[in-house]
Amino acid sequence: MTTFVIVHGAWGGGWEWSPVADILRGHGHRAFTPTLTGMGERDHLSHGEPVGLGTHIDDIVAVLEFERLRDVVLCGASYGGMPATGAADRAADRVRLLVYVDGLVPVSGRSAVDLFPARYADMIRDGLAEHGPAWRVPMPAALFDALIPAGSVPEAVRRDYLDRIRAHPAASFTEPIHLTDALESVPRAFIRCTAGGYAEQAGGDPVAAGAAHALEAGWTYREINTPHDPQVFDAEGIARLMIELAN
């Protein structure tokens, strides 16, 4: 039995990985899908208050500690690669494997926005300058349409996702991550989503550098033929890959 902790991406919540968690549990594993502060059902916690990357790292470390989890396969999807990495660094003794699911691979001293295409990086920095550190950035409609195009899934599924999307605490995008040598003791793997689509709309692919680094560093590397959000398009497939990597 493996214990999985899956960290969701920007604008989402633990809810979006629940189907994958159910599949993992059906195979006899434990699975946790925590929601980061200010997102999903915890959206209300960021109203009027800045929420940075450090808080999101605290969220994941708290799950590991309070649930008394050890030998964990910690998975960071998209933006979730940032807090997952920070948590693996702080709680390296609890993490067996750190898996990036088309996730951001951070560089110590830099922030998520440093990895973003210029159009979105500028939008976030300008919004924070105008509205202050508690500003929450809405998901651009064009980005949602590129991530889950009309007709790619049943319309009811697409509407349900859109209904649960929440504005993301912008400060978490701009707060730099600071890593220690502890992270080097944690094995890492990368799952690349190859069916593209959103990068053209975004003006660049923010996870491409991490995927290239994974190959250069000799991490275990796998691919899945889905767009950027595999939990939407192939929950069974991404669950199988996670189990394969855990073994």
Label each residue range with its predicted role.
Residues T2-D43, E65:
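Conserved HGGG/HGGXW glycine-rich cap/lid loop of the alpha/beta-hydrolase fold
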Residues R30-F32, L36-V73, D89-R90, A112-P117:
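Active-site loop/oxyanion-hole signature of alpha/beta-hydrolase fold enzymes
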Residues C75-G80, A84:
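Gly/Ala-rich beta-loop-alpha elbow adjacent to hydrolase catalytic centers
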Residues D89, V95, V99-A141, P206:
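Flexible "cap/lid" loop of the alpha/beta hydrolase fold
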Residues D163-A182, D205:
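Active-site nucleophile elbow and catalytic-triad environment of alpha/beta-hydrolase enzymes
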Residues S185-C193, T220-Y221:
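Catalytic His-Asp charge-relay segment
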Residues A195-D234, L241-L245:
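Conserved loop-alpha-helix segment in the C-terminal half of the alpha/beta-hydrolase fold
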